[in-house]
């Protein structure tokens, strides 16, 4: 049974579906990033991945709050969680740079998709108060791309993860002690 209020406009329903899709994408991402983090032995790589995971968690929670403001409870889809774990298993064990290279294909389409949500539903985005979370969603994907490219270019771990760390609103994981 749908919990959608009959007074929602078509634009709001489209926005709701887009936000639900983005939320489930973060459910996938949290599962994947956590599993990859658990698999890493190098302390700097593990720290970087923990930072990436924290951003995923924050965005998942922010999207859940945005959905709640729209009157909908975000329920993590077990299929998305399982798919995130399966994706992690596919890349766990790959050499570091090869694993990072895998993400260079997946992230740019997400920037386009999340940017399009705000444009396609412009009239509803501000009304329901979700522009900030959509903007942050785009910035997080862009920061992830910057991280992957910086790592592939050989930048220092503390520098390459900088754009991601800058997005964290909660506590920043402690970097490894050398």
Where are these regions (language model features)?
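Non-heme di-metal
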Residues: 2-178
């Amino acid at each position: 049974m749908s919990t959608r209020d009959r007074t929602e406009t078509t634009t709001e329903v489209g926005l709701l579906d887009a936000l639900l899709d983005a939320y489930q994408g973060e459910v996938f991402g949290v599962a994947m990033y956590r599993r990859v983090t658990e698999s890493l032995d190098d302390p700097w790589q593990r720290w970087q991945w923990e930072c990436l995971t924290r951003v995923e968690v924050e965005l998942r929670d922010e999207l859940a709050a945005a959905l709640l403001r729209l009157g909908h409870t975000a329920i993590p889809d077990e299929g998305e969680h399982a798919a995130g774990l399966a994706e992690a298993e596919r890349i766990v064990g790959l050499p570091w740079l090869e694993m990072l290279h895998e993400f260079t294909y997946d992230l740019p389409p997400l920037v386009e998709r999340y940017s399009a949500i705000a444009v396609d539903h412009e009239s509803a985005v501000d009304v329901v108060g979700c522009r900030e979370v959509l903007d942050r969603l785009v910035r997080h994907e862009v920061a992830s791309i910057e991280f992957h490219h910086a790592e592939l270019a050989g930048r220092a771990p503390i520098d390459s993860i900088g754009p991601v760390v800058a997005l964290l609103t909660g506590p920043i994981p402690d970097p490894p002690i050398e």
